[in-house]
């Protein structure tokens, strides 16, 4: 005799099979339209041709949606009954919720108004229709699933009379970590729903520590704005831009957004975006230059003088040659080292974030608005060639700024100036306690952003890491909240390598080589013993050491990534090796030691970077160096 759990699981499998059969029927109807040869369409008359092409594109989009439904048809089911005197609607009804609507199987999209009922406890609740009508219902049963490639990997069930119960849970691989228990997933989804369904108009901020799910919340809000009938006309996907820190994050987003049904969204780094505006095709971007503090001080002295920007009363003039514009600005500095350093930049044709920000500020003041000007040649009658310039004023329906805390206030102001007045919609994602750049935003007032308190979402719990990793971070005096149901993992390994004494002559270089060889050997053992599917991140502040490690292991395993800590922000690995830990790893240049405010902010950035490094791992961390990490942090107080 079957148990109740077995019967429930069998019923779920029957439903999944029913969906698959219904999808197979839909495939047969859609395929002839979705895959109609373009040659056949081109044979049609003009009006018919355009109509056939639209039908083909629509059918192809639906075909891709059906493929996604087939893999993961739904993630929630509610058994409901409407609270009404009309007997036609008082019978119980099963409704499912998934990524895409499939009305043939009573599956609603997650953005449908009724989808909010999945967060209610069994019993009486309500939902609101787009026209404002409130529908009162009773939720009799709830079921939550995780279905991957048509296979059930998680299933929980609850009713009005019985609390939530786990029906089935498959073993989860280390790649994604153990499942973080239903109640935690449910809490995240409630926060997600509050975020995605908030009014579209105006700025929104989502903050939280690394691994708290803030990026997921932000991107689901984007998906909702693009797909919801109430907002989709205001947010065409090709009018949305997402600003990311680096190419690695860009690649991650470029895969994640289509999975949420979002296509044609622009994803750019600040430099890529600025390059289109300023025509920096032959310029290389560098993170920071040696005169960072001098440049920041000069930037902070720029005053808006109405029609012109000024420094100490002197007008800054715009030149199409960005290097000439910046040379004129830096000529106003009293720092000879800045002037000399920038001359070297001109020779190498490199610009940093401060250079580009100043140039964009000048461009905007000169042009009035940020715009992209594209030149092309047009062939006129009699073969005459005329140069044509197309001007596109930047006017985005939505701007998403990932890791907003790493931008200068002026950068954020430039982004904000390109947002449509119809929406004024910006989503800021990040955490002010994870800054990796000097001179960046400290508070919203820094660039005149006013975000209502109820639109500032703060996540506290971390879901990416193991309990042991967060306990280790807490032992280093980082303020971390550790969820009770968080997965367990191996204890953090901290290896201090001892210097081996040799001859007095060249002892320092010998010791350095000896320690480095021990680090290489340790890393080699980790790579030998790891399973094939596990990803490894080798992280360091020491770029030279990182380069030698990359060269040493370049042919060992392509799943191993060698990154600076700053480059690793937003990336995650199964195993992380933090290498090059020493008491000298955060020494400031002597010329900056007399600037207490600069030194204090730099020390805080270094502490934040260490926290970022520790939270890159989903399972296992090895800290390797000549001293303990706790000793390094003592020097940063």
Kindly give the residue locations of the regions a language model identified.
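Extended, charged low-complexity regulatory segments
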Residues: 1-185, 189-197, 428
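P-loop NTPase Walker
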Residues: 2-8, 15, 19, 163-166, ...
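Short N-terminal helix-initiation segments at or just after the protein's N-terminus
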Residues: 19-22, 147-150, 180-192, 342, ...
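Alpha-helical nucleic-acid-binding subdomain
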Residues: 103, 108-109, 191, 226-424, ...
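Short, well-ordered alpha-helical scaffold segments within catalytic/effector domains
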Residues: 181, 185, 189-193, 215, ...
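Short gly/ser/thr-rich secondary-structure transition/capping motifs
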Residues: 186, 379-385, 557-563
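Conserved helicase motor core of SF1/SF2 NTP-dependent helicases
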Residues: 238, 247-248, 255-263, 268, ...
């Amino acid at each position: 005799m079957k148990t109740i759990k077995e019967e429930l699981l069998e019923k779920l499998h029957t439903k999944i099979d029913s969906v698959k059969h219904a999808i197979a029927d839909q495939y047969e109807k859609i395929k002839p339209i979705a895959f109609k040869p373009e040659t056949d369409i081109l044979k049609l008359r003009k009006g018919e041709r355009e109509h056939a092409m639209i039908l083909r594109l629509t059918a192809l989009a639906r075909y891709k949606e059906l493929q996604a439904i087939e893999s993961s048809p739904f993630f929630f089911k509610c058994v409901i009954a409407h609270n009404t005197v009309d007997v036609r609607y008082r019978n119980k009804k099963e409704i499912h919720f998934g990524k895409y609507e499939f009305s043939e199987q009573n599956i609603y999209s997650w953005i449908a108004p009724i989808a909010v009922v999945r967060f209610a406890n069994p019993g009486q609740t309500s939902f609101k229709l787009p026209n404002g009508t409130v529908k009162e219902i009773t939720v009799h049963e709830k079921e939550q699933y995780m279905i991957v490639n048509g296979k059930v990997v998680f299933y929980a069930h609850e009713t009005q009379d019985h609390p939530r119960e786990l029906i089935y849970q498959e073993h989860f691989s280390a790649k994604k970590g153990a499942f973080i228990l239903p109640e935690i997933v449910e809490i995240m989804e409630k926060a997600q729903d509050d975020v995605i369904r908030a009014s579209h108009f105006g700025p929104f901020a989502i903050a939280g520590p690394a691994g708290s799910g803030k990026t997921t919340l932000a991107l689901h809000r984007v998906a909702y704005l693009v797909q919801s009938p109430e907002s989709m006309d205001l947010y065409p996907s090709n009018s949305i831009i997402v600003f990311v820190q680096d190419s690695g994050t860009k690649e991650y987003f470029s895969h994640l957004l289509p999975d949420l049904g979002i296509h044609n969204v622009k994803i750019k780094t600040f430099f890529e975006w600025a390059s289109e505006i300023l025509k920096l095709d032959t310029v290389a971007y560098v993170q920071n230059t040696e005169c960072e503090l001098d440049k920041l001080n000069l930037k902070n002295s720029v005053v808006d003088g109405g029609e012109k920007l000024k420094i100490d009363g002197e007008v800054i003039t715009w030149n199409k040659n960005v290097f000439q514009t910046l040379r004129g600005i830096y000529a106003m500095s009293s720092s000879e080292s800045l002037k000399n350093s920038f001359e070297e930049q001109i020779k190498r044709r490199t610009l940093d974030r401060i250079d580009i920000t100043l140039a964009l500020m000048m461009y905007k003041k000169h042009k009035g608005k940020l715009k992209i000007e594209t030149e092309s040649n047009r062939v006129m009658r009699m073969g005459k060639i005329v140069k044509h310039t197309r001007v596109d004023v930047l006017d985005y329906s939505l701007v998403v700024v990932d890791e907003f805390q790493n931008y200068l206030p002026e950068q954020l102001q430039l982004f904000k100036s390109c947002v449509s007045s119809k929406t004024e919609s910006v989503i800021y994602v990040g955490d002010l306690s994870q800054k990796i750049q000097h001179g960046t935003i400290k508070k919203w007032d820094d660039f005149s952003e006013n975000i209502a308190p109820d639109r500032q979402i703060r996540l506290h719990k971390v879901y990416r890491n193991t309990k042991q990793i967060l306990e280790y971070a807490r032992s280093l005096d980082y303020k971390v909240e550790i969820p009770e149901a968080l997965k367990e993992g191996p204890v953090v390994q901290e290896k201090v390598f001892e210097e081996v004494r040799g001859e007095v002559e060249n002892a320092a270089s010998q010791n350095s080589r000896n320690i480095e060889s021990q680090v290489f050997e340790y890393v080699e053992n980790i790579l030998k013993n790891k399973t094939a599917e596990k990803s490894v991140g080798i992280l360091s502040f020491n770029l030279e050491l990182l380069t030698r490690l990359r060269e040493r292991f370049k042919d060992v395993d392509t799943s191993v990534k060698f990154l600076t800590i700053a480059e690793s922000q937003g990336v995650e690995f199964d195993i992380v090796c933090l290498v090059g830990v020493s008491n000298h790893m955060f020494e400031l240049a002597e010329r900056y030691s007399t600037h207490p405010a600069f030194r204090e902010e730099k020390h805080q950035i270094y502490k934040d970077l260490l926290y970022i490094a520790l939270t890159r791992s989903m399972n296992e961390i090895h800290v390797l160096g000549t001293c303990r990490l706790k000793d390094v942090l003592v020097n940063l107080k």
